[in-house]
Swiss-Prot record:
It is found in: Cytoplasm. PROSITE patterns: ARGININOSUCCIN_SYN_1, ARGININOSUCCIN_SYN_2. Disulfide bonds: none annotated. The keyword Nucleotide-binding applies. It comes from Chlorobaculum parvum (strain DSM 263 / NCIMB 8327) (Chlorobium vibrioforme subsp. thiosulfatophilum). Keywords: Amino-acid biosynthesis, Arginine biosynthesis, ATP-binding, Cytoplasm, Ligase, Nucleotide-binding. It comes from the Bacteria. Homotetramer. This is Argininosuccinate synthase. GO terms for cellular component: cytoplasm. Belongs to the argininosuccinate synthase family. Type 1 subfamily. The gene is argG.
Length: 401
């Protein structure tokens, strides 16, 4: 019987570190190929390879996905206005398909026989990874250790890691599960599982508490071209650099802390804490520029598309014809979304200070209540009569019955 060659989505965290040892025990003689994708998360890159090899991996691959993540995923979601259940900017959910694709690419190049991930059996990520695997490599076997192994808690995993000299940062006193990329951070587990418990200060990874944020606000100008942010305070920037800078400015001012109860793909509700400074700022700015530049029916209908797009991302069906079809619609809507938005960042809040666009549909002469008003007030009488004619007729027939 041939030995398995297993491609592992490796983060260096508790689950994937324990997983390498567990896979080698379960599949005797298996060759483990560890694959780490860089989505802009803070990590000790130099330590990942020796850690993976010391844990039992035969080889290690590090793939820089940051530019692709921004241009092919984040900007698409931003243009669509994709906020899951009106709150979550989908940082983790957006990152999973591109990580899964990178794992598939390495697995195919290395001749692997199996794909594996470190997702729990009650979370969303198992769906996102495995649906992507099925979309891109339907012939490959998939194993999900966290659905099979004997550990029933993170505390048991920590004990196992300590017993087998597996280096991990999680401790029984600090049991948070944290996932990070350039678009945001998700924090769960521990005391956060009680929805009545306020997030402890140590749960937050990058943002300053709004109460401790600077007393002087930060004002930023963000330029967009066809829905994509291209400049900050008048300086042209690559997408990656712009997001990094806004994360820094937002975090400093306590912007981007989110606490929500969300509906998971698998049918349960979960309490999630997110930090997403840049995403919060950019979604706010983009939405305000759309208010200025989009025709009324497009603006209102696009809100429905944004929810559909968010569901596609959250539910793990990124590599689908439906997502591609929605991209085509969104791209048309974004043609006029060019201009500048000025914002104030202050103690956890994002406040609109101004917006301008060469494609603005705001006509001050029509909107003003001064002598410069050019709106035809006399036309309103006939418009109202026709606009309300249906309800008037209905009431004449039905009132008094």
């Amino acid at each position: 019987m041939s030995k398995e060659k297993i491609a592992v989505a490796y983060s260096g965290g508790l689950d994937t570190s324990v997983m390498i040892k567990w896979l080698k025990d379960k599949y005797e003689g298996a060759e483990i190929v560890a694959v780490t994708g860089n989505l802009g998360q803070k990590m000790e890159v130099d330590n990942l390879e020796p850690k993976a090899l010391a844990t039992g991996a035969a080889s290690f691959h590090f793939v820089d996905l940051r530019k692709t993540f921004v241009e092919d995923c984040i900007w698409k979601a931003l243009k669509a206005g994709a906020l899951y259940e009106d709150v979550y900017p989908l940082a983790t959910a957006l990152g999973r398909p591109i990580l899964a694709k990178a794992l598939v690419d390495v697995a195919l190049a290395e001749g692997c026989t199996m794909l594996t991930h470190g997702c729990t059996g009650k979370g969303n990520d198992q769906v996102r990874f495995e649906v992507t695997f099925a979309s891109l490599a339907p012939h490959m076997k998939v194993v999900a250790p966290l659905r099979e192994w004997e550990f029933t808690s993170r505390e048991q995993e920590i004990t196992y890691a300590l017993e087998h000299n597996i280096p991990v940062s999680a401790t029984k006193k600090n049991p948070y599960s944290i996932d990070e990329n350039i678009w945001g951070i998700s924090i769960e587990c521990g005391v956060l599982e009680d929805p009545m418990v306020p997030p402890p200060a140590d749960a937050y990874q990058i943002t300053t508490s709004p109460e401790e944020a600077p007393d002087k606000p930060t004002v930023v100008d963000i330029d967009f071209v066809e829905g994509i942010p291209v400049a900050l305070d008048g300086q042209q920037m690559e997408g990656l650099d712009l997001i990094v800078k806004l994360n820094e400015l937002g975090a400093m001012n306590g912007v981007g802390r989110l606490d929500m109860i969300e509906n998971r793909v698998v049918g349960i509700k979960s309490r999630e804490i997110y930090e997403a400074p840049a995403a919060t700022i950019l979604h706010f700015a983009h939405r305000e520029l759309e208010r200025l530049t989009l025709e009324k029916s497009v603006f209102q209908y696009k809100r429905n598309i944004g929810q559909d797009y968010a569901n596609i991302i959250y539910n793990g069906t990124w590599f689908s014809p439906m997502r591609e079809a929605l991209d085509a619609f969104v791209d048309v809507t974004q043609k006029p979304v060019t201009g500048m938005v000025r914002l104030k960042l202050y103690k956890g809040n994002v406040t609109l200070l101004g917006r301008t666009s060469p494609n603005s549909l705001y006509n001050e002469e029509l909107a003003t209540y001064t002598e410069a008003d050019t709106f035809n007030h006399k036309a309103a009488e006939g418009f109202i009569q026709l606009y309300g004619l249906g309800l008037k007729t209905y009431s004449e027939v039905n009132l008094g019955k």
